[in-house]
Amino acid sequence: MVFIPRAKTYETVNPEYSNYAGEAFGNFQAMLADIPETLGETIPDFHNMEFRLKQLREAVAKDAAGRVSEVKYYLDEIEKRADEMCKAERLYREGKLPKRVCHCDTKVNNMMFDEDGKVLCVIDLDTVMPSFVFSDYGDFLRTG
């Protein structure tokens, strides 16, 4: 492990630092673009929406905490969108959407900044595996 002196991490950043962070994740994607999708999955089905919906439906059917009725509206909204939410996996199976090596946890606190707010490196690489690039992009927008 390498120690990087004066490096900082942040939970939230200003727009300028966010810009640097977005550029760094873009560079990260570009550097990994030629690595084949055959890289192993570190967390199977981590970003697989079909799998996640199946898990949700199983949890709803069990209603272990007895609260499903309290969130029925939200569950109905999810079901209305389920087909669209699973579109990426279908397109992938049809050979119409590729998977690329992605970070899969793209958030601003998974990079180290210098004193001027420039990104030194992307960290927390335990989730690097094949996924959809737009998942990394969306994950970063959620936190950036």
Feature-to-residue mapping (PLM):
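ATP-dependent phospho-/nucleotidyl transfer catalytic cores
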Residues: 4-19, 24, 34-103, 110-116
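Activation of the activation-loop gatekeeper triad in protein kinase-fold domains
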Residues: 123-128
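Active-site activation/catalytic loop segments of kinase-like enzymes and analogous catalytic loops
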Residues: 134-144
